[in-house]
Amino acid sequence: PDVVHLNNFNYQLTPSIILEVKKWSKETSHKCKIVFTAHDYQLICPNHMMNNPNTGLNCELCVGGHFMNCTKGKCIHGSTVKSFIGTLEASFWKLNGVYKYIDTIICCSHFMKSKLDTNPLFKEKTVAIHNFIDKVQWKDTPKKDYILYFGRFSKEKGIGTLIDVCK
């Protein structure tokens, strides 16, 4: 292929896929660009959310590669062990240098881009492309007492705030 487009890789599919693409490219003498679409903050935060689930507060302590803060804050499922494993994984891939092979990182918002740009390795590679939908003609509809939420039902998505606002 001329381009390999990866989305979030984690758990069973690790960044090792990047090394395999580079290995194939070298073996075949075929240039292959790697594009990565970031749907979370995995590249700069071991728990992927930049949020401490124990406190509910936004957190940037790991930004800059200070991944041990994930362990200190028990940021992965409130577990020291799971957080330490996440810290080791993030540190391994950082030290391994695998991310230097990514040619372009697509961020789904300018905010995400600004956070990934804190890593000098990513700064010249990021681009913000918002998720998109076709523009539809808006129709006035009668107001009713319900809401529609489409997304993962989890605390960090702000479900509690949405419910509070609707009361």
Please tell me what each predicted stretch does:
Residues 1-3, 12-19, 89-94:
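An amphipathic, basic-hydrophobic alpha-helix
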Residues 24-34, 123-124:
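A short helix->loop->beta-strand "cap" motif at the edges of active sites that frequently abuts
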Residues 17-18, 45-51, 56-57, 72, ...:
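Short aromatic-enriched loop/helix-cap "lid" or pocket-rim segments at secondary-structure transitions
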Residues 111, 132:
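Carbohydrate-associated surface elements
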Residues 106, 139-157, 163-167:
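Conserved donor-binding/catalytic core segment of Leloir-type glycosyltransferases
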Residues 35-36, 100-110:
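A short beta-strand/loop micro-motif in the catalytic core of glycosyltransferases
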Residues 1-13, 32-37:
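Short N-terminal targeting/anchoring amphipathic segment
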Residues 23, 42, 54-105:
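Membrane-proximal helix-turn-helix segments that form the acceptor-binding/catalytic region
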